[in-house]
From Swiss-Prot:
This is 2-isopropylmalate synthase. Residues 5-267 form the Pyruvate carboxyltransferase domain. It is found in: Cytoplasm. Keywords: Amino-acid biosynthesis, Branched-chain amino acid biosynthesis, Cytoplasm, Leucine biosynthesis, Manganese, Metal-binding, Transferase.
C-alpha cells in the first residue's frame, strides 16, 4: 500500500500576496469550491488577524467547505491564535497553523530574542492553539537557513507541545534539492518524537527549485506538501501543486506515494485561478501551459502519429483538457449549452443555467460561433456579477478617427438613466471621462490590461484594471467582444465596489453615532 501525501493549498493566503489587489470574498469562495472539488486535503483560507476582509473570507469558506479541512494562519501570538479560532469555529473540521522564525538572521535581527525565548514562544503558541483544536500545524519560518541543531530542538519542542504537523519551509527559496532533502532526513534521524507528527514542506521558487525541493523532501519522508495553483505567490512564487500532483501520479512506480487529487480537475482549477487572479499562465509552463501538450517537431509528430507514448508521458485528458474545442451557435438551445457544460466537466451547482444561457445568446448573436472557452469565460463572470450593481452600462456608441475619439453612453444610476458624451485621446479615454462625470467618481488607475479569451478575431476581450481610491486598491474586470465595452465594464466593476464600500462606511458611521 502506498503512503499518502497530504496536499495543502495556500493559494488563498500565500498565493494572494502576489496580487495587486485582494480577491473579494465571493472570488475566494469560488476558488475554495474548486480546490475542494480538486481533492485538496487542506485549504489555507487566509490570515484572519491581518484584516476584517481576511477574517470574513476565512469564516465564509469555513462555513461552506465540507470535504476539505479549512486552515487559518496565525503568528505565535495569543491574539492571532484566538482570532484564527474565532474565524474557523463554524467549520466542520479545521486546522490552526501558527509559525515563528527560526533562522539565525531572523531570530537575531527580526525577533531580537534568544533562541531559548523563541522556543518558549513556539511552545506557548502551539498549546494555545490546542485549546481550540487537535489539528495544529507549526511552521519553522526560514527553516532552510536554520542551523540543524536549532531546528531539531524547535521541532522536538513543538511536537511535545501538541503540534501534529511540523512544516519545514524554504521561505526564501535558498536551498538545493539534495540539501533540502538532507534537512528533512536529518530531522527523521535526530528528533526522538518525530513519529508523532507529519512532516510538511513549503518551498518557494526564488531559484526555481520549489518543486524539486518538495519532491526531494517527499523522498526523504515528508508526507505533506504545501503550495499553490499555478505556483502563484509573491516574488518568484510557490511550489506548483498541479506539478506535484502529476509528478506523483506519473512516477508513482518510483516514488511509492499517492495523493487524493482528482487529476481531471487540474486544468479547470488552474484556468479559474488564472482568470480570477488576472495572472496569465506562461505558455511553456509544465502541466497547464498552452504548449504543455503541443508537438511541433516533425520527428516528434511522426512518433506521436505512430504511438502517442513515444513522446507523451501523460495525456491532456488526464488533467481534464479536452482535445477538441466545442462550438455552438445562436440556434443552439438550453439543452445543448447544458450538454456542453457537462462535457466540460461542470455540474449544476457550478453555474446558473438561466443566466449562462441568456449571456450565451447575446454573445452568439454578436460572434456567430461560441466555443467551450467562451462558455467558461461567461460562467466565471456570471458567477462574480452582482445583481445589485448601482451603475450599469445600458448603451455605448463610439466614433473614432486618427486624432480624437467621441464616446456617447447611457448609464443606469440606480433608478435613473443618465446620458453623457465626451471627446478623448482614444475611445477608452473618452468612455472613462463619461463614466467619471456620471458617477461622480474619478479614480487613479495603477494598471490596465487587455487580454484575449479565445482564438481568432472573434475571441472575447477581457479588461483588467487595478484602481486606487482613497488609499485602497480595487480590482475590476470586464468581458465583451468589444474591448472598449470590456474596458467600461471593468471600470464600472471598480466603481460599484467603491460605491458599496462607501455605503457600508456610512452605515457603520451612523451606527457608531447612535
Amino acid at each position: 500500500m502506498k503512503d499518502q501525501v497530504i496536499i495543502f493549498d495556500t493559494t488563498l493566503r500565500d498565493g494572494e500576496q502576489a496580487l495587486s489587489a485582494s480577491l473579494t470574498v465571493k472570488e475566494k469562495l469560488q476558488i475554495a469550491y474548486a480546490l475542494e472539488r480538486l481533492g485538496v486535503d487542506v485549504i489555507e483560507a487566509g490570515f484572519p488577524i491581518s484584516s476584517p476582509g481576511d477574517f470574513e473570507s476565512v469564516q465564509t469558506i469555513a462555513k461552506h467547505i465540507k470535504n476539505s479541512r479549512v486552515c487559518a494562519l496565525s503568528r505565535a501570538v495569543a491574539k492571532d491564535i484566538d482570532v484564527a479560532a474565532e474565524s474557523l469555529k463554524v467549520a466542520e473540521a479545521f486546522r490552526i497553523h501558527t509559525f515563528i522564525s527560526t533562522s539565525t538572521i531572523h531570530v537575531q535581527d527580526k525577533l531580537r530574542r534568544s533562541y531559548d525565548d523563541v522556543i518558549e514562544m513556539a511552545i506557548a503558541a502551539v498549546k494555545r492553539a490546542r485549546n481550540y483544536t487537535d489539528d495544529v500545524e507549526f511552521s519553522c519560518e526560514d527553516a532552510g537557513r536554520t542551523p540543524i541543531d536549532n531546528l531539531c530542538r524547535m521541532v522536538e519542542a513543538a511536537i511535545n507541545a501538541g503540534a501534529r504537523t511540523i512544516n519545514i519551509p524554504d521561505t526564501v527559496g535558498y536551498t538545493l534539492p539534495s540539501e533540502f532533502g538532507g534537512i528533512v532526513a536529518q530531522l527523521f534521524n535526530r528528533v526522538p518524537n518525530i513519529d508523532k507528527a507529519i512532516i510538511s514542506v513549503h518551498c518557494h521558487d526564488d531559484l526555481g527549485m520549489s518543486v524539486a525541493n518538495s519532491m526531494a523532501a517527499v523522498q526523504a519522508g515528508a508526507r505533506q506538501v504545501e503550495g499553490t495553483i499555478n505556483g502563484l505567490g509573491e516574488r518568484a512564487g510557490n511550489c506548483s501543486l498541479e506539478e506535484i500532483a502529476m509528478i506523483i501520479k506519473t512516477r508513482s512506480d518510483f516514488l511509492g506515494v499517492e495523493t487524493n487529487i482528482k487529476h481531471e480537475e487540474i486544468h479547470r482549477t488552474s484556468k479559474m485561478v488564472s482568470q480570477l487572479c488576472n495572472m496569465p499562465i506562461q505558455a511553456n509552463k509544465a502541466i497547464v501551459g498552452a504548449n504543455a501538450f503541443n508537438h511541433s517537431s516533425g520527428i516528434h509528430q511522426d512518433g506521436m502519429i505512430k504511438n502517442k507514448n513515444t513522446y507523451e508521458i501523460m495525456t491532456p485528458e488526464s488533467i481534464g483538457l479536452k482535445s477538441q474545442a466545442l462550438n455552438l451557435t445562436s440556434r443552439s438551445g438550453r439543452a445543448a449549452v447544458k450538454n456542453h457544460m457537462d462535457t466540460l466537466g461542470y455540474i449544476d451547482g457550478d453555474y446558473n443555467l438561466d443566466t449562462l444561457y441568456a449571456d450565451f445568446l447575446k454573445l452568439a448573436d454578436r460572434k456567430g460561433q461560441v466555443f467551450d472557452y467562451d462558455l467558461e469565460a461567461l460562467m466565471y463572470f456570471a458567477n462574480l456579477r452582482d445583481e445589485d450593481d448601482f451603475f450599469k452600462l445600458n448603451y455605448l456608441s463610439v466614433q473614432s478617427g486618427s486624432i480624437m475619439a467621441t464616446t456617447s453612453i447611457k448609464l443606469q444610476c440606480g433608478d435613473e438613466e443618465k446620458c453623457e458624451a465626451a471627446v478623448g485621446n482614444g475611445p477608452v479615454d473618452a468612455l472613462y471621462q463619461c463614466i467619471y462625470r456620471l458617477t461622480g467618481y474619478e479614480i487613479a488607475l495603477d494598471k490596465f490590461d487587455l487580454t484575449a479569451k479565445g482564438e481568432g478575431e472573434d475571441g472575447l476581450g477581457q479588461a483588467d484594471i487595478i484602481a486606487n481610491y482613497k488609499g485602497r486598491k480595487y480590482h475590476g474586470t470586464g468581458l465583451a467582444t468589444d474591448i472598449v465595452e470590456a474596458s467600461g465594464q471593468a471600470l464600472l466593476h471598480v466603481i460599484n465596489s467603491i460605491y458599496r464600500a462607501d455605503q457600508i462606511a456610512e452605515i457603520k458611521e451612523r451606527i457608531a453615532t447612535v
